[in-house]
């Protein structure tokens, strides 16, 4: 039984590779919080979390001042026990972003540590359900892009083997969204998935109106049409449209997902590994969705995000429209520690008290 003795924390700001504009904001920075745990046997595990430009230093402070002092000295194999202990330890601070993002950094590091110790890739020790998953692209679908650019990107994505594209909607007039989606459907045909993402921009009535206007285009889903805390609105929308409603990236607890699933307020669950608090609760949500016969399409899957290219040397393998699960032990990420040290705005170390 090897106990956790030492932790290193880095916060690295990463600029987006392309300009990103949706219905509510423009992305300017990804604050990446990287946590490296060392156990008494000399083994290490690295996890990470992220923010969209705000709050990264608060996540670091919660880790350094409260969570890591409680973690150090624990048996690194007790992942479930550690997650539950830290979850309830922080419960009084409220279930939400800062707490969940900090928990995720610890939890993913522990999974990486365990997988590395047994010499297996993460997807194997998490159950090994699939060795590859179909992929779609969002990078050409931002709201500021002209219609012609959306069509060109969709053509390239289809030629490259992607299974679909997702674009942002939320133009001032419904007719603009309809024109853009219609142009895409005509360009790629009916054998290619199209999804739309609203980024919580609409009222209930506006979302219902836009869903009806887009119904003819056989959409794979309409994502985050309403504010995430509007459960009743999602119930109304789900009952009024044939388009599958996707939610989850802005839900921060298992209980929130339970409510959506019990009320049949969504058809696609997009649980985010960082925002839910790590791999441990992510798996709980995925299995809960399975019990309701609801599909899972993960949001912002942590090891896939292209911005990490600046601080990693490994790359995801995509072949014939499928992302192949990494086969190396752990998360499958080769971190560039020199780049991390060079780019980090915050670097801290926490050791177990003597």
List the model feature ranges, each with a label.
Residues 42, 67, 106, 119, ...:
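Conserved, mostly hydrophobic/aromatic
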Residues 19-25:
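Short, P/G- and charge-enriched loop/turn segments at secondary-structure junctions
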Residues 212, 218, 229-322, 326-329:
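Shared catalytic-loop signature of beta/alpha-barrel
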Residues 6, 38-117:
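Metal- or metallocofactor-binding catalytic centers and their adjacent structured scaffolds
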Residues 2-15, 26, 301-354:
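Flexible C-terminal active-site loop/helix
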Residues 124-127, 131-240:
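Metal-dependent enolase-superfamily TIM-barrel catalytic cores that perform enediolate-based chemistry
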Residues 33-40, 314-318:
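Short beta-strand elements
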